[in-house]
């Protein structure tokens, strides 16, 4: 018989990319586990929807309605998001936006606030710059605005809605903004007491507040902001270092007992420069999802890059707007499931 053949060596496994940052929250034992993110459940439309853009609309118009393919799947999905955003709310609500510098945190805050304002015309929506490192929220919404926390809190004659908005800026979507400390002029540092008084006044008139937070979790102002939030958006770059910072933010919330806020949070992977690697993005997104946090990827959009006023209606790319609609609808779902706190907060005065 022929001699036995030597065994074939096993192939060398391919080299795996570096593992993404690990998020391992350790909430107190008595706290409930984070609930699953809410699924928007829009009410059915009374009439069939017509395509409002693209080749489907062109075909319908060219044939005088004889050929009507209806809205595309993407348009139907957008309509679901919009109906979720427009769901009935009681009282007033706050969502914070956190992230380290350079990840597009302010762009996310301005975009989400603008969509809330555009789609909830019956309410008043305000964006608040609580970033003490010369935040730029005002320049993304209304660069002409000169109002500040100190003016808003010092004036004792601000009784009506019109009195208050005279101290605020506003964009075309209807989003009002309270800017932070200007880069020029005497330096004044926003403290928790001034922030608390300003938001108390704004709560009298605004249903939804979007707060652009500072990047230092242990800062007294950031902790004051977190204390009063109903939902949180954690913004990350689609790179390992940005995701590590986002993971540390979520761990900080768990370690400090903010498990309810953690359950009402989501991660936005924001491609702010257009150089993100698709495979890395997928790995990072899966890491957060595996640890119970919903992740929404926002693609690169040249409109958001220069640093000017954000226009969610005319200038923002449709794919980007669709992702921000999903972010905003998810936050609206968190708002809708909050227990009634009408005794804690005054209803908005219109």
Please provide the spans of the model-predicted regions.
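Extreme N-terminal, non-catalytic leader segments
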Residues: 24-96
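Walker A/P-loop phosphate-binding motif and the immediately C-terminal alpha-helix
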Residues: 77-79, 91-131, 138-139, 202
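Phosphate-binding loop that captures ATP/GTP phosphates
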Residues: 119-176
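Phosphate-binding/switch loop-helix module in NTP-utilizing enzymes
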Residues: 170-172, 176-220
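Inter-motif core of Ras-like GTPase G domains
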Residues: 203-207, 220-240
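Conserved C-terminal guanine-recognition region of P-loop GTPase G domains, centered on the G4
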Residues: 246-264
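Beta-strand-loop-alpha "switch" segments that mediate conformational coupling across diverse proteins
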Residues: 271-317
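NTP-binding/hydrolysis catalytic cores, primarily Walker-type P-loop NTPases
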Residues: 306-350
């Amino acid at each position: 018989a022929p001699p036995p053949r030597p065994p074939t060596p096993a192939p060398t496994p391919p080299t795996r990319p570096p593992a993404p940052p690990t998020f391992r929250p350790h909430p107190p034992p008595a706290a409930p586990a984070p609930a699953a993110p809410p699924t928007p459940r829009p009410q059915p439309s009374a009439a069939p929807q017509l395509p409002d853009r693209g080749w489907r609309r062109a075909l319908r118009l060219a044939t005088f309605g004889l050929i009507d393919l209806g809205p595309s799947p993407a348009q139907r999905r957008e309509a679901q998001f919009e109906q979720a955003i427009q769901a009935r709310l009681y009282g007033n609500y706050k969502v914070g936006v956190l992230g380290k510098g350079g990840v597009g945190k302010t762009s996310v805050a301005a975009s989400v606030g603008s969509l809330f304002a555009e789609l909830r015309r019956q309410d008043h929506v305000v964006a608040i710059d609580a970033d003490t490192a010369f935040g730029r929220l005002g320049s993304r919404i209304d660069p002409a605005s000169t109002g500040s926390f100190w003016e808003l809190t010092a004036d004792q004659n601000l009784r009506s809605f019109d009195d208050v908005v005279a101290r605020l800026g506003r964009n075309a979507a209807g989003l009002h903004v309270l800017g932070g400390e200007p880069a020029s002029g005497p330096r004044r540092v926003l403290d928790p007491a001034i922030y608390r008084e300003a938001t108390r006044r704004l709560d009298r008139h605004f249903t939804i507040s979007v707060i652009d937070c500072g990047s230092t979790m242990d800062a007294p102002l950031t902790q004051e902001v977190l204390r009063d939030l109903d939902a949180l958006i954690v913004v990350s770059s689609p790179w390992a270092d940005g995701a590590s910072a986002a993971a540390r933010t979520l761990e900080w919330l768990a370690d400090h007992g903010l498990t309810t806020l953690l359950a009402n949070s989501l991660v936005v992977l924001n491609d702010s420069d257009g150089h993100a690697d698709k495979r890395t993005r997928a790995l990072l997104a899966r890491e957060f999802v595996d640890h119970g946090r919903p992740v929404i990827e926002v693609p690169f959009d040249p409109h958001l890059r220069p640093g000017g006023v954000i226009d969610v209606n005319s200038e923002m790319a449709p794919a980007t707007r669709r992702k921000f609609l999903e972010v905003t609808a998810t936050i609206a779902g968190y708002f809708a499931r909050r227990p009634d706190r009408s005794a804690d907060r005054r209803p908005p005065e219109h």
